[in-house]
C-alpha cells in the first residue's frame, strides 16, 4: 500500500480524502511539514505500519521551501510514494467557505487568499501523480474517487437489533421496522417462555404464506436500504426490528435476516436482542 501525500487548496476536500483513507485503515497525520515526511516514514516503518497518508498545505507554508529535497529523498526510499492534489474553482471554494464560516489559513480576503494559495502550492501540484478537480463533486463522490484511485475496499457493515416497542424503539437505529403483524407465539403456552432463537418459535412466526410474503418483502427492503447506504459512502447502517415485547417475532426475524444476509454480499452482524430473556417471558 502507498505512502500518500494529500495536498490541495483550502476547501477542496482534503479532510474528506484523509477521512476516507483513515476509514480504509491508513495511519493519518494532518498538517505535516515536508521536513518531517522522512521522519514519519522512519517512525511508521519501525512499527510495521504500511498504509500511511499525510497532508501538507499552506498551514505549513513556512516549511514549503524544504518541499523538493524532502520529496526527492522520500521518493528514493518509497517506491510506492503517491501525491494527490485537490483543487476547485474559486467560486465553489468561496461558497464552501461561506457555508463553513471558517477563516482561510492565509488570513486575507478570500479571493486574494485563493490566488495566493494556488501560487504557494504550485510546486506540490507539479509533483502530484493525480490531480482531482472537486468543483462538481459531492463529499461522497470524492470519497468514492479516492477509494477507486487507491483500489481500496469500502468497509460496510449492516447491523441488526431486535427490540420490543413497549420498551421504546432504539435511538441509534437508522431504520426501524415493525413486525407485529406476524403470528405471535406469545399466545401459544408451549412457546411463550421460549425465544425467537428456537426453531419451533421461528416456525410458528413464519407458519403461513402471508408471513413468508411479509418477510420476503421486508428482507428485500432491508437489503436495498443497506446497498444504498453503502453506495452513499456509509460505513455502517443499523436496522431495528421490533415486536411488542422483543421476545419472539423480532428475534426470529433478526436471526433469519442475519443468516440469509450473511450469505449475500453484505457484511451483516447482530448487535443485540435487546429485550429478549432466555428461558422466560419478556419484561
UniProtKB/Swiss-Prot annotation:
Does this UniProt record's set of keywords contain Nucleotide-binding? yes
UniProt-annotated binding residues for GTP: 57-60
Q: Which InterPro entries match?
A: P-loop_NTPase, RapZ-like, RapZ-like_N, RapZ_C
Q: Which Pfam families match?
A: PapZ_C (PF22740), RapZ-like_N (PF03668)
Residues where ATP binds: 8-15
**What superkingdom does the record give?**
Bacteria
The GO terms describing molecular function are:
ATP binding; GTP binding; molecular adaptor activity
Ordered alphabetically, the record's keywords are: ATP-binding, GTP-binding, Nucleotide-binding
PANTHER family found in the cross-reference section: RNASE ADAPTER PROTEIN RAPZ
Query: What the protein does?
Result: Displays ATPase and GTPase activities.
Q: Which family does it belong to?
A: Belongs to the RapZ-like family.
Q: What is this protein called?
A: Nucleotide-binding protein DR_1434
Amino acid at each position: 500500500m502507498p505512502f500518500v501525500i494529500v495536498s490541495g487548496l483550502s476547501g477542496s476536500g482534503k479532510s474528506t480524502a484523509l477521512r476516507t483513507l483513515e476509514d480504509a485503515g491508513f495511519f493519518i497525520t494532518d498538517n505535516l511539514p515536508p521536513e518531517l515526511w522522512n521522519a514519519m516514514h522512519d517512525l511508521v516503518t519501525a512499527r510495521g505500519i504500511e498504509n500511511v497518508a499525510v497532508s501538507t498545505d499552506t498551514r505549513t507554508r513556512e516549511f514549503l521551501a524544504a518541499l523538493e529535497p524532502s520529496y526527492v529523498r522520500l521518493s528514493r526510499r518509497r517506491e510506492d510514494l503517491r501525491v494527490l492534489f485537490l483543487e476547485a474553482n474559486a467560486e465553489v471554494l468561496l461558497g464552501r467557505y461561506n457555508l463553513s464560516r471558517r477563516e482561510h489559513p492565509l488570513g486575507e480576503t478570500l479571493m486574494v487568499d485563493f490566488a495566493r494559495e494556488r501560487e504557494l502550492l504550485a510546486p506540490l501540484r507539479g509533483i502530484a501523480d493525480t490531480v482531482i478537480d472537486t468543483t462538481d463533486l459531492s463529499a461522497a463522490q470524492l470519497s468514492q474517487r479516492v477509494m477507486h484511485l487507491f483500489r481500496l475496499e469500502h468497509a460496510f457493515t449492516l447491523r441488526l437489533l431486535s427490540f420490543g416497542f413497549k420498551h421504546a424503539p432504539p435511538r441509534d437505529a437508522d431504520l426501524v421496522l415493525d413486525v407485529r403483524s406476524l403470528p405471535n407465539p406469545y399466545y401459544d403456552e408451549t412457546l411463550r417462555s421460549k425465544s425467537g432463537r428456537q426453531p419451533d418459535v421461528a416456525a410458528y412466526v413464519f407458519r403461513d404464506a402471508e408471513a413468508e410474503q411479509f418477510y420476503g418483502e421486508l428482507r428485500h427492503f432491508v437489503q436495498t436500504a443497506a446497498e444504498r447506504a453503502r453506495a452513499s459512502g456509509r460505513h455502517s447502517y443499523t436496522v431495528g426490528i421490533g415486536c411488542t415485547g422483543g421476545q419472539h417475532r423480532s428475534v426470529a426475524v433478526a436471526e433469519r435476516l442475519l443468516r440469509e444476509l450473511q450469505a449475500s454480499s453484505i457484511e451483516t452482524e447482530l448487535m443485540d436482542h435487546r429485550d429478549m430473556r432466555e428461558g422466560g417471558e419478556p419484561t
